[in-house]
A protein has these predicted regions:
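Long, charge-rich, low-complexity alpha-helical segments
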Residues: 33-88
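Long, low-complexity intrinsically disordered regulatory regions enriched in P/S/T/G and acidic residues
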Residues: 1-2
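A short, structured beta-strand/loop element
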Residues: 8-49
Length: 88
């Protein structure tokens, strides 16, 4: 992760800037929360539809980066998660 002043660059498309959306992860140049897009991906929404819903403010490459970073974070922190079995 690189920093540019107080802005954290997590990749080519994803940033955390305290001056934008209180430092939440957003797509560079937008106020679109990475979390919102990842929730849309998780719900099964087609990526093309997600892009259209955000008026083409994000790209397929940006969504790919978000999914890759989320995957990496999960794999790096797996031991911190404790899942309770679902009741049958």
């Amino acid at each position: 992760m690189e920093t540019n002043g107080s802005t954290k660059l997590l990749g080519r498309y994803i940033v955390a800037d305290p001056k934008i959306c209180h430092g939440q992860l957003t797509f560079r140049g937008t106020r679109i929360f990475v979390e919102d897009v990842l929730e849309q991906v998780a719900s099964g929404m087609a990526w093309e539809t997600i892009i259209e819903e955000w008026h083409n403010s994000i790209t397929k490459e940006a969504i790919t980066e978000a999914v890759q970073l989320a995957t990496k974070a999960l794999l790096n922190h797996t031991d911190e998660f404790v899942l309770e079995p679902e009741p049958v």
